[in-house]
Structure formats: C-alpha cells, structure tokens
Curated annotation (Swiss-Prot):
Gene behind this protein: accA
Identification of the protein by name: Acetyl-coenzyme A carboxylase carboxyl transferase subunit alpha
PANTHER family associated with the record: ACETYL-COENZYME A CARBOXYLASE CARBOXYL TRANSFERASE SUBUNIT ALPHA, ACETYL-COENZYME A CARBOXYLASE CARBOXYL TRANSFERASE SUBUNIT ALPHA, CHLOROPLASTIC
Entry similarity comment: Belongs to the AccA family.
GO cellular component: acetyl-CoA carboxylase complex
HAMAP family: AcetylCoA_CT_alpha
Catalytic activity of the protein: N(6)-carboxybiotinyl-L-lysyl-[protein] + acetyl-CoA = N(6)-biotinyl-L-lysyl-[protein] + malonyl-CoA
EC number, UniProt record: 2.1.3.15
Species: Erwinia tasmaniensis (strain DSM 17950 / CFBP 7177 / CIP 109463 / NCPPB 4357 / Et1/99)
Subunit structure: Acetyl-CoA carboxylase is a heterohexamer composed of biotin carboxyl carrier protein (AccB), biotin carboxylase (AccC) and two subunits each of ACCase subunit alpha (AccA) and ACCase subunit beta (AccD).
Protein's UniProt keywords contain Methyltransferase: no
Role this protein plays: Component of the acetyl coenzyme A carboxylase (ACC) complex. First, biotin carboxylase catalyzes the carboxylation of biotin on its carrier protein (BCCP) and then the CO(2) group is transferred by the carboxyltransferase to acetyl-CoA to form malonyl-CoA.
Length: 319
C-alpha cells in the first residue's frame, strides 16, 4: 500500500522505492547468486533512521500537512480499533442526518459510552457524502441529541475532532450554523457526565469547538487546533495563501504549544512517521489515554465534575 509520502518525506520515499525494487528483483529471479536480504535490511534500517531524523524536527506547517494526511485514521477507524459493539445513531430529529458527524453507543472495555466525531471521506464519493468532514447545523444538532441521550443514561461522552471547520454554505447559514455551534458550547459545559475530547487530525475553528468542550481535551502528536487554517490566516494577513507555513508557525497550532498554554491536557504520542503508519498502535495509545482519563473523572461527584469543568474553561488565557 502506498503511504502517500508528503513533500518533506521524499528522501524516505526514495529509500523505500529502492527497497521495493530490490525485493521485486529477488522475487522475479530466485536463482540469483546474490543474497539481497542483507542489503534490503540495511536500507530498511537506514529508512527508519532517516524517518526518525526528519520527524524529530518537524515545523508547524509540516505537522499541519500530517494532520490532513489522506491515510490518517478517522473517527470510524478508531471506533473499529478501540471500541466494541458500536451501534450508530442517525439524524437530528428536525431536518436531516448529516454524514459529516457520526455518533452512537459503543463499549470501551465493556463500559457503555457515547461516541461522537467528525468523519471525512477516503474516496471521492465518500468525501462528497461526508462533505469533506465539514458539518452543517443538523450535524451539530445530531451531536447534541446524542449528548443529551448520554446524560440521560449516565454514559460518558467521547468525542473525536477532525474537521477543517463548520460548513460555510448559504444553506447552512440559513439553517442556523452559528446558533447550533453556540448551543453546543453552552450545553456541553453543563453536561452531568464525563466528557473527553480528542483532536485526531484537524481542529478547525468553531466547527471543532462545537464538540470540543470537555473535562479532558487531548491531541494526537501530529494533529492541529486553531481558530483558522494557516492558509486562511495567511490570506488575511499577507494577502497570499503561499505564506501558510509562516502563519502556521506564528499561530501556535501544534499540540506541544497548546499544552504549554494549558489549552489541552495531554499529547498522545504517534508511531514513527505518523498515525497512518500504524493505526493499531495509535489505537492502543488512544485507548490507554481514554481509560486513564475516565478513571480520573470517575472519582468526582457530579457537582465536582461540573465545577472542575467550569474552572477549566474560566482558566483559558491565564497560562
């Protein structure tokens, strides 16, 4: 399977191409007197070393590219790898079922939880059906319906954030996009069950915040969280999207910086090369973090849970 190497990964791609070429030669002519195994292993070791070197010094713009990687695991991938017995729930009971938001009941280590997350698409048809992970108001109203259901049945809520932003179309605005986002922000702050939010890819503006108010907010190592995309910021400040790398650095969109500012709680390490290189490994790391967060929140009474969430929200800007 092609890993869809990004521009800054091209030296790695060239090494991997050499490895594939040598392996292909070995398969085509098994009678070769030359043993290629040692050379293949040498190149593999070199590839790992090069990958480690490149990924040890990534800039914010490179991380933004990784956050958008077409093979990066999406919400439904984590549902399969982390949870069991998932039963998807659909519709906002008012207008439509927005496929850019998925949600339903599942089990985390036999414990019922409510899962809600953005869902992008892989192939063209699915991308269109999912609206490229940009929810309309009915998506956020569906999310709120599921949150209220979780509260009614005393189930923890686990959200996965991965969107370039809420859909800015005319129809979405006519149906109350800003109201839907604002209502979610208000209602999530008062939910009487644990809420754990994790940014797994792009955390774009209000579209991310609408399912991002929680007791714990985590980010994967190569995810981003920002009020606007680097391209959008560059277009406003420098009148050119070409300045996106400069904007990404200035905006502080990466996980370590956001943890330093106390806007998030934990950074979940990704496998070498990014989450798409080993979906099962990142699934295991995510599961461990979710279980640890739930264990911490389970020690609180409902009053303590709400008070701690309130204090957490009010502390923003005082890092």
């Amino acid at each position: 399977m092609s890993l869809n190497y990004l521009d800054f990964e091209q030296p790695i791609a060239e090494l991997e191409a050499k490895i594939d070429s040598l392996k292909s030669v070995g398969r085509q002519d098994e009678k070769l007197d030359i043993n290629l195994d040692e050379e293949v292993q040498r190149l593999r070791d070199k590839s790992v070393e090069l990958t480690r070197k490149i990924f040890s010094d990534l800039g914010a713009w490179q991380i933004a590219q990784l956050a958008r990687h077409p093979l990066r695991p999406y919400t439904l991938d984590y549902v399969r790898n982390v949870f069991t017995d998932f039963d998807e729930l659909a519709g906002d009971r008012a207008y439509a079922d927005d496929k850019a938001i998925v949600g339903g009941i599942a089990r985390l280590e036999d414990r019922p939880v409510m899962i809600i997350g953005h869902q992008k698409g892989r192939e063209t048809k699915e991308k269109i059906r999912r609206n490229f992970g940009m929810p309309a108001p009915e998506g956020y109203r569906k999310a709120l319906r599921l949150m209220e259901m979780a509260e009614r049945f005393n189930m923890p809520i686990i959200t996965f954030i991965d969107t370039p932003g809420a859909y800015p179309g005319v129809g979405a605005e006519e149906r109350g996009q800003s109201e839907a986002i604002a209502r979610n922000l208000r209602e999530m702050s008062g939910l009487k069950v644990p809420v754990i939010c994790t940014v797994i890819g792009e955390g774009g503006s209000g579209g991310a915040l609408a399912i991002g108010v929680g007791d714990k907010v985590n980010m994967l190592q190569y995810s981003t969280y920002s009020v606007i995309s680097p391209e959008g910021c560059a277009s406003i400040l420098w009148k050119s999207a070409d300045k996106a790398p400069l904007a990404a650095e200035a905006m502080g969109i990466i996980a370590p910086r956001l943890k330093e500012l106390k806007l998030i709680d934990s950074v979940i390490p990704e496998p070498l090369g990014g989450a798409h290189r080993d979906p099962l490994a990142i699934g295991a790391s995510l599961k461990a973090q979710l279980l640890a967060d739930l264990a911490d929140l389970d020690t609180l009474t409902k009053a303590e849970l709400l008070d701690r969430r309130y204090q957490r929200l009010m502390s923003y800007g005082y890092a």
